[in-house]
UniProtKB/Swiss-Prot annotation:
It comes from Aspergillus flavus (strain ATCC 200026 / FGSC A1120 / IAM 13836 / NRRL 3357 / JCM 12722 / SRRC 167). Pfam families: DPPIV_N (PF00930), Peptidase_S9 (PF00326). The active site is at S754 (charge relay system), D831 (charge relay system), H864 (charge relay system). This is Probable dipeptidyl-aminopeptidase B. It catalyses: Release of an N-terminal dipeptide, Xaa-Yaa-|-Zaa-, from a polypeptide, preferentially when Yaa is Pro, provided Zaa is neither Pro nor hydroxyproline. GO terms for biological process: proteolysis.
Length: 916
């Protein structure tokens, strides 16, 4: 799960040829603000649903099983004491087939006249869809599952690595060429493309060829990091993945001038290194091996041991599993000071953290051969995994004085106790000062400390009691920017820009001096900044950021002065847009990425003046634009619903050639984890698009209460009671959709993965078969006491403080789930994130009450992403086929089975018209 995220009018636009590659095409729209009185819906319960009819499909391979039931195998023919002759048996079968065909013809005629769903479409029906279509007019092919799973619909995107020039130049970027080309790694100066009057440098090759020879060995670097002075490059080969962000490898120092390399630690050339970072002065590398920290000064081949007691339970400079997954979302907890004189790093002690065994039945991820006699036993990896309420790792901040070769802590007053401290950010200022942000275990109290490493003292400079402010929490973030003093530009003191809560929304605040708790607000309003600030132009005193100012579903780029004045948009806000941006070191240039709703594109722009005078498009995605012209894509309808006073964002995906006179099955797809977002304006062709385009079903996604970017009122409503309000919102919206004239209320399903899997089960539990007949839950949490402490307690408090909340959030009412027609459970057997314990204990509850209306599939050795062997392709095929069978009514046929004792019984079951 991990940390994986106001529109008044609904907009109707087809994802078809009417999209433009520039992202500026207009779209037809219609207003649609929906509200509902939930008390009314609670008093108007639906009756039990009849057996499902055959599903809406565009291809005959998804036809109902009725077509195959005429060919009955001989073992299922009736038996009696008198043996039937072949003629008698043939005549019986013949007349049964005649009756079956006549009944099927009559039934098909009735269903056709009443606009019922046929198992395949006729030409006149297809024409009728085209004529009544409100969106797509393309006669192209439907999206295929193979295309989605192989990334054929993924936009091509360039990730530019901006780098500061050795002499303060702005606009330098690092690029890597194809492996078989010369000039494998080079630094280019984007200023050289602006014009003759711009002072710039020519490109410089850092690594000529990808293959590097060291002591007779050929290396193929997986990752490369140039030194700040661009004279050396840190290479990593022999990559091995650890957790989500972390990995290990062999590291090398490459000399640009001689095009030669040497081991990072010449005494241990084959040692696997967990982390390596250049010093700002380019004369040293700090690295971690076997959980201990080391320093390699380039002036010597010897290595200095910074720590010596690191080991299985003690980490230096790198996070343990839970910090990597839920707090830092990175592989490093090591920070060089700006002058290269100090290194700050975390010491993580997880000796008190209980272990969870992850078993591997097919593979051996460790790469080790088992001892003789144990070849037939699974490999077990013991993970230090703190579940809710269990001991957390104890984390302390330490400092290393490079010149004195000394490690020291700094005690600060008013710090959190060891068992109630989460350090979420460390930021170096100037003159050896450090800003440290920490929270309590439940993430609802924030303390900001200012530490002076020279005097080895510290003090508390800010305290925020989030629990008393709005009852919510604070998310870990790592975007705080240090603003150095510059009296000539009106900044007499050092400061920093942080994201704070202001009138119920996340906004930017400028704190100066460093110990001033009262900021200058840079942004305000009923919208939020996102992962901000993006960059700061210190010369001009301008802050750049991305925000939801136009709509929670959009992202635009803005700038504002450090005094909070002159807020301006850099992107075109007159049209829906979802932008991302990365700035050069001095914020004079940027890579602007348009990610939707039209075909994505990328351009490099200059931002150093009042106007953008330079723009170079580096990606237009022509292949993707051509595919959009060729394929019949769903129509996306963005709107909002208002439930219990909360305005929530929603997108409905309609099949191509949508016909409002027909009735369509509906699939609700959700994630709905706290602060997450699934309803946005990005260009996305995914599994949901495949369902709408290829299977012909409507897909609805609602960001219910608890989701992000709509303000803290919406976000914090779920605290302490995960699943309750989110499920209520999904069910309420589904009841609204069930009343729409084009929706088949007898064929409604819901599905999700991870938190979405939890929500699928919670919805089915709360709904008890009234609205949703089907559900598909992948890797679900079923009891929050089984999930990791940092994530869970942020939103639920500890089990000790909130026992009733944990009980309410657990999937316990399996009797309610038994009222659904059927549901599907899927889990990776080696999931290190959401443990298979969740699904197995839930299945035990089903067993105890003899609940049998479910299917289950486990994927051996797959983690939370379910990729091992053929799992990635198979799981989506499984989901697709299961859903087709559900909407074709086949799961009705396996409920309460009875043996067939005559051909006539088979006929009656095959032709519902004869069953009455």
């Amino acid at each position: 799960m991990g940390r994986t995220g106001d529109l008044e009018n609904a907009e109707f636009f087809p994802m078809t040829r009417r999209r433009s590659t520039s992202g500026t095409s207009s779209r037809s729209s219609t207003d649609s603000g929906l509200s509902v009185d939930t008390a009314y819906l609670e008093d108007n319960k639906h009756n039990n649903f009849a057996n499902g009819t055959s599903g809406l499909t565009d291809e005959t391979k998804y036809r109902d099983v009725e077509d195959a039931e005429a060919d009955v195998d001989e073992p299922f023919l009736p038996t009696s004491s008198k043996k039937l002759g072949s003629g008698s048996r043939t005549r019986q079968i013949f007349w049964a087939l005649v009756i079956l065909c006549l009944g099927g013809w009559v039934l098909a005629l009735v269903l056709f006249l009443t606009h019922g769903r046929a198992s395949s479409q006729t030409a006149s029906e297809t024409l009728q869809q085209q004529e009544s279509d409100s969106g797509s007019t393309s006669a192209g092919r439907p999206v295929t599952l193979q295309q989605v799973l192989t990334g054929s619909w993924n936009p091509r995107a360039h990730a530019i690595s901006w780098i500061a020039g050795p002499d303060g130049e702005d606009g330098l970027l690092v690029q890597r060429a194809e492996v078989d080309k010369e000039g494998y790694m080079r630094v280019d100066d984007i200023r050289s493309q602006e014009g003759d009057d711009v002072d710039s440098q020519s490109g410089r090759i850092l690594i000529d060829k990808a293959a590097v020879r060291v002591n007779g060995e050929t290396l193929m670097p997986t990752f490369t990091w140039p030194s700040p002075d661009l004279n050396k490059v840190l290479l990593m080969s022999n990559h091995e993945k650890n957790w989500r962000y972390s990995f290990t490898g062999r590291y090398w120092i490459f000399d640009v001038a001689t095009q030669t390399a040497q081991p990072l630690d010449p005494s241990v050339p084959d040692g696997r290194v967990q982390l390596a970072l250049w010093s700002p002065s380019s004369d040293a590398v700090v690295f971690v091996r076997d959980n201990n920290m080391y320093l390699r000064k380039l002036s010597s081949e010897s290595v200095v041991s910074i720590t010596k007691d690191g080991g299985e339970d003690l980490f230096y400079g790198i996070p343990d599993w839970v910090y990597e997954e839920e707090v830092i979302t990175d592989k490093s907890v090591t920070w060089w000071s700006n002058d290269g004189k100090y290194v700050a790093f975390l010491r993580t002690n997880e000796s008190a953290v209980p272990e969870f065994p992850v078993q591997y039945f097919v593979s051996r991820p460790s790469g080790k051969r088992p001892p003789p006699g144990l070849e037939n036993y699974p490999e077990v990896r013991q993970i230090k995994y703190p579940k809710a309420g269990s001991p957390n790792p104890v984390v302390n901040l330490l400092f290393y004085d490079v010149e004195k070769d000394e490690v020291f802590p700094v005690d600060v007053p008013d710090d959190f106790p060891d068992d109630d401290r989460i350090i979420i950010e460390v930021l170096w200022a100037s003159e050896g000062k450090v800003i440290v942000r920490a929270t309590n275990r439940e993430s609802d109290r924030v303390k900001v400390f200012l530490i002076d490493t020279k005097s080895r003292t510290g003090k508390l400079v800010r305290f925020e009691d989030i629990a008393n402010l709005d009852g919510g929490w604070v998310e870990p973030s790592h975007y705080t920017k240090f603003i150095p003093a510059d009296p000539s530009n009106g900044r007499p003191d050092d400061g920093y820009i942080d994201t704070v809560i202001h009138d119920g929304y996340d906004h930017l605040a400028y704190f100066t001096p460093l110990d001033n708790p009262d900021p200058i607000m840079l942004t305000t309003g009923e919208w939020e900044v996102v992962e901000a600030p993006s960059a700061v132009d210190l010369r001009r005193g301008i802050v750049y950021f991305v925000a939801t100012k136009e709509s929670p579903t959009q992202r635009h780029v803005y700038r504002v002065h450090l005094d909070g004045s002159n807020l301006q948009a850099l992107t075109d806000t007159s049209k829906p847009g979802f932008y991302d941006v990365s700035f050069s070191d001095g914020a004079g240039y940027a890579l602007l990425s348009y990610n939707g709703p039209s075909v994505p594109w990328q351009a490099i722009i200059n931002t150093g003046g009042d106007e953008i005078t330079f723009e170079k498009t580096i990606e237009k995605n022509p292949r993707l634009a051509s595919m959009v012209e060729t394929y019949a894509l769903p129509t996306e309808i963005y709107q909002n619903v208002t439930i219990d006073g909360f305005t929530l964002q929603l997108v409905e995906r309609r099949p191509p050639h949508f016909n409002p006179a027909k009735k369509y099955p509906v699939v609700f797809q959700l994630y709905n984890g706290p602060t997450s977002q699934r309803v946005d304006r990005k260009f996305t062709i995914d599994f949901q698009s495949y369902i709408a385009s290829n299977l012909g079903y409507i897909v609805v996604t609602l960001d219910a209460r608890g989701t992000g970017y709509s303000g803290r009122k919406v976000r914090c409503a779920v605290r302490g009671n995960l699943g309750h309000y989110e499920a209520h919102d999904q069910i309420t919206t589904a009841k609204m959709w069930a009343k729409k004239p084009y929706v088949d209320e007898t064929r409604m399903a819901i599905w999700g993965w991870s938190y979405g899997g939890f929500m699928t089960l919670k919805v089915l539990e709360q709904d008890a078969g009234e609205t949703f007949q089907y559900g598909m839950a992948v890797a679900p949490v079923t009891d929050w006491r089984f999930y990791d402490s940092v994530y869970t307690e942020r939103y639920m408090h500890t089990p000790e403080h909130n026992p009733s909340g944990y009980e309410n959030s657990t999937i316990t009412n399996v009797s309610a789930l038994s009222k659904a027609t059927r549901f599907l459970l899927i889990h990776g057997a080696s999931d290190d994130n959401v443990h298979i314990q969740n699904t197995l204990t839930f299945v035990d509850k089903l067993d105890l009450l003899n609940v049998q209306n479910y299917d289950m599939h486990f994927y051996p050795d797959s983690d939370h992403n379910i990729y091992f062997h053929n799992a990635h392709f198979m799981i989506y095929e499984r989901l697709s086929n299961w859903l087709i069978n559900a909407f074709n009514g086949e799961w009705h046929q396996i409920a309460n089975p009875v043996p067939e004792d005559s051909i006539w019984d088979s006929v009656k079951r095959s032709v519902p018209a004869f069953a009455h």
